[in-house]
Amino acid sequence: YLEIEKLSKLLSSSKSEHILTRSLTKVPETEAETRRYIIDVDLKLMGWEFEGPNKNVFEEFKVANPYIPGGPNLSVDYVLMGRDGKPLALIEAKKTSRNINDGKTQALAYANALEREYGQRPIIFLSNGYETHMWDDLEWNMRRVSSVYGVSDLERLIVRRKLDKPILSTIPINDNISARSINT
């Protein structure tokens, strides 16, 4: 617990320092500016690699069109790959003035296409640079997060998703417990 608390304080202090030293000369007006000036910076701070031998961020990543079979491919704003070469997450970016929910349907289609192609469903992130939401549509509702997660955290979420979970209908019911009167 002490290690977690120490790490939390370290990250909190570096975040405050980053906020103080980071300045934007102008507010990003387009999606491209939002991506370059805000989202790209945040991804790099979380350890994601945009180039080189350890590249794991792929921008404008092409996926099969789920709406028109054989139609033109669609472009996912960002696909974040794991060490196994499978997609851990996708990010649907919007410009700062847009509601991030505007990209929800689009992101869901991208997740479906990536799952069909790679056999692994990615975690979905929606971001307009100022607000980021994470959504694992297989496990839980969308929720606001402070940033896109790093590689290790996303890999852990994917592994947890794959763990064997007993299906309640397959667990035998002990009638000696369930059929008795509560007041006896």
Model-derived regions: residue spans:
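ATP-dependent helicase/translocase motor core
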Residues: 1-184
